[in-house]
């Protein structure tokens, strides 16, 4: 930032002979629907893209959102429950909970490009069909592969915070950036381990886990921002599953004569919880 004063700025009459280049090129590591370039597998290989269309071409689409329906005692004191409908006598609650899903890379890419992102690298370390979260050994291999790409300036593993190996993965990210000395790691503070955990406890735990090495090569952004990239067309009855194989009696939750209980019974009576891809 300049201090107050008078400055002389000379404007060139000739066009700029220097070609503009991207100053921030991130590398994203995570789980994708697939990883294919025609007949060639892209699994574990850094792949350069410039748009969401290219991401979908090589790495597929989004994981299917799933919300779990259940009936339990009222009041509801579960942070995973998005909302609940009380029964007429107030003793029961029909709950709609967000199902834990470790696959978030796709939505991070949507946000990246929607906010002006351009050139980046993708390294797929697994698929939705495998049903497993990010594996730390595969992340280590992906980081080793990124050593050959000198233009990368940031490293991101969006799904690391949702795995029990978060500490090790983030440590490896910092070590990689410290070794390369031309990039830094963007880290996430893990979600609450328990409902009554306060913000200071989360931060202290994060600082302990990342250790004391290569801290100048990383940045953590906190608290989390609640947002959504889903549209109306992404939400319909197919995203709801029961937490049990049989449907409970729903008549106490709706007015007499309501068609909703019958609708739920016919639609979801044989829908056990499952992660779909």
What are these regions (language model features)?
Residues 1-277:
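Surface-exposed assembly/interface segments
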């Amino acid at each position: 930032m300049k201090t107050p004063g008078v400055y002389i700025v000379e404007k060139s009459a000739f066009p700029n002979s220097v070609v503009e280049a991207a100053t921030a090129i991130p590398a994203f590591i995570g789980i994708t629907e697939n990883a294919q370039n025609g007949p060639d597998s892209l699994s574990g290989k850094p792949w350069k893209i410039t748009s969401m269309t290219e991401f979908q071409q090589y790495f597929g689409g989004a994981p299917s959102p799933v919300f779990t329906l259940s009936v339990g005692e009222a009041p509801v004191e579960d942070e995973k429950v998005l909302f609940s409908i009380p029964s007429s006598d107030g003793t029961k609650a029909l709950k709609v909970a967000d199902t834990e899903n470790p696959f978030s890379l796709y939505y991070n890419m949507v946000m990246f490009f929607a906010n002006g992102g351009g050139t980046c690298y993708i390294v797929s370390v697994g698929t939705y069909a495998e049903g497993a979260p990010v594996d730390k050994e595969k992340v280590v291999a992906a980081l080793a592969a990124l050593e050959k790409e000198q233009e990368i300036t940031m490293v991101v593993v969006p799904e690391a915070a949702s795995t029990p190996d978060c500490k090790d993965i983030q440590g490896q990210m910092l070590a990689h950036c410290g070794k390369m000395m031309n990039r830094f790691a963007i880290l996430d503070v893990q979600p609450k381990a328990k409902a009554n955990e306060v913000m200071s406890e989360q931060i202290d735990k994060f600082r302990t886990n990342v250790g004391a090495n290569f801290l100048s090569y990383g940045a953590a952004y906190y608290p989390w921002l609640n947002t959504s990239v889903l549209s109306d067309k992404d939400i319909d009855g197919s995203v709801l599953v029961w937490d049990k194989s049989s449907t409970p009696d729903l008549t106490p939750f709706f007015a007499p004569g309501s068609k909703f209980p019958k609708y739920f019974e016919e639609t979801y009576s044989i829908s056990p919880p499952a992660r779909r891809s």
